[in-house]
């Protein structure tokens, strides 16, 4: 990603990834999220010493992004793409139009080591319903999904090396979702789960 790039943090939540991208790399970041309050995020960014030109919080639906075409040098999506990107047309129709030619899309999502939706392990059902687990798939599923995209080159789809570290960090959080996930992981559900990294480049 070039220095001074304009980057979309898609599904940004409270904007922690946005802050990292702005502080560590000097990018101009649009923190786009449907469920968080842009004003609350703005207060948080102000408290963290980030200017209003460094991070711009935006309330946005991932399926109807409110930006100019070819606006972004790159898109980063952490722990959210699996909720809206499971439609094979999503990349071509809903996301890539807003990315410049040659721009990168970086995705990191929770997944499964091997899809097991036909016979869900009891350990996983301690924390999640079958409907919730339908948002989690293995690398083969995601490789097939993004490979159907006509407008981007698939550079890599792989299990993240930091898998256990990422899960441990998540489970230490005290928010209600992390607390709810502990039952499954404490029962050994982690042996079925991973984190998946996807890198694409717009043609």
How would you label these PLM feature ranges?
Residues 1-6:
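Short helix-loop-beta connector
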Residues 8, 14-64:
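Class I SAM-dependent methyltransferase SAM/SAH-binding core
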Residues 63-75:
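A short acidic, Gly/Pro-enriched loop at the edge of an enzyme's catalytic core
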Residues 74-87:
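A short SAM/SAH-binding and catalytic strip from SAM-dependent methyltransferases
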Residues 89-104:
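A short glycine-rich, Lys/Arg-flanked "PGG" loop and its adjoining helix->strand segment in the class I
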Residues 110-132:
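Short, glycine-/aromatic-enriched active-site segment of Class I SAM-dependent methyltransferases
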Residues 134-150:
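Short alpha-helix
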Residues 156-203:
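Conserved Class I S-adenosyl-L-methionine
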């Amino acid at each position: 990603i070039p220095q001074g790039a304009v980057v979309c943090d898609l599904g940004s939540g409270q904007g922690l990834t946005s802050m990292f991208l702005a502080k560590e790399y000097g990018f101009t970041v649009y923190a786009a999220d449907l469920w968080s309050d842009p004003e609350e995020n703005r207060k948080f960014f102000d408290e963290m010493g980030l200017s209003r030109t460094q991070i711009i919080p935006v309330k946005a639906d991932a399926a109807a992004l409110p930006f100019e075409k070819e606006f972004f040098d790159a898109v980063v999506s952490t722990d959210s793409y699996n909720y809206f990107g499971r439609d094979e047309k999503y990349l071509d129709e809903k996301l890539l139009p807003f990315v410049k030619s040659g721009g990168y899309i970086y995705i990191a999502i929770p997944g499964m080591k091997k899809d097991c939706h036909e016979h869900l392990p009891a350990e996983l059902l301690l924390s999640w319903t079958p409907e919730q687990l339908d948002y989690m798939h293995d690398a083969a599923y995601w490789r097939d999904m993004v490979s159907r995209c006509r407008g981007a080159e698939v550079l890599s789809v792989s299990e993240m090396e930091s898998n256990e570290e990422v899960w441990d960090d998540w489970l230490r959080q005290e928010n209600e979702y992390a607390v709810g996930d502990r039952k499954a992981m404490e029962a050994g559900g982690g042996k079925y789960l991973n984190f998946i990294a996807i890198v694409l480049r717009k043609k």
